[in-house]
Amino acid sequence: MGIIQPGNPLPTIHLKDQDKNEVDLTSLKETKLLLSFHPLAWTGVCQRQMEALEANVEALEKLNAQALGISVDPVPSKKAWADAIGISITRLLSDFWPHGAAATSLGLFREADGISERAAVIVDGEGIVRFVKVYPMSEVPDIGELLETLKAL
């Protein structure tokens, strides 16, 4: 399966956040979504990626957008990591079981490694994917570019 392309609807995805709340991504319509996939918690680049989301919560709200951090880590790990790095507003979603199902549904799962790509997927308020970018594992996604993309929607 290839990577989801702009113009396609976001598939049905249900995940739990770091506080064990069920999140149905398709129910978040009328809000733009920035799905920020990161390979694993407890790694430096992933930490900087999530800190960039947290630092831009107000900017995202002004754009009627919400950022969600997603990785294959289990919920307790997401909770401990969020607490350790000071993430208190941004929801960190667990794609742990079925392992990598959300990433797989978007064509972003690295089967050989058991993790997702580092990627950003932007979804408009109608549930349509409008932007997809896969980043090198060593690179923090450019939050400025992502905010500009959201602003243009």
Question: What are these model-derived regions, one by one?
Answer:
Residues 1-153:
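Chalcogenol-based redox active-site neighborhoods
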